[in-house]
């Protein structure tokens, strides 16, 4: 009786572990390589942090970007900023967070972050927010 329970427990643990690790690893490796290609294609420099040395300083926690000429709505900025913050937490690369916020969120990295965070079902809502703050 004890050996049957032990064997059953081992089978369940192995099945759960194999299912959990295969999906997570494939998604994160695929997403990471896509993000690396996306970020490297947009910059002419081989150094990923080279844009930080420009005249403007970039603050990761800044909610409002002074370059955005549209309607100032703190709630929309917080919502858009949250996407970039979550994307940074997903990839743990500082240039993901800063590049995501460039051009008032109207860039391909922001779109890729929406895709990687599985927010495609509310894409229109975020696009509307980007258009509102970036007019």
From Swiss-Prot:
Produced by the medulla terminalis X-organ in the eyestalks and transported to the sinus gland where they are stored and released. GO terms for molecular function: neuropeptide hormone activity. This is Crustacean hyperglycemic hormones A*. Residues 1-26 form the signal peptide. Its main location: secreted. GO terms for biological process: circadian rhythm; glucose metabolic process; neuropeptide signaling pathway. One of its GO terms (cellular component) is extracellular region. Belongs to the arthropod CHH/MIH/GIH/VIH hormone family. Hormone found in the sinus gland of isopods and decapods which controls the blood sugar level. Has a secretagogue action over the amylase released from the midgut gland. May act as a stress hormone and may be involved in the control of molting and reproduction. Keywords: Amidation, Carbohydrate metabolism, Cleavage on pair of basic residues, Disulfide bond, Glucose metabolism, Hormone, Neuropeptide, Pyrrolidone carboxylic acid, Secreted, Signal. InterPro entries: Crust_neurhormone_CS, Crust_neurohorm, Crust_neurohorm_sf, Hyperglycemic, Hyperglycemic1. It is found in: Secreted. The modification Pyrrolidone carboxylic acid is found at residue 62. The gene is CHHA*. Pfam families: Crust_neurohorm. Disulfide bonds join 68-104, 84-100, 87-113. It comes from the Eukaryota.
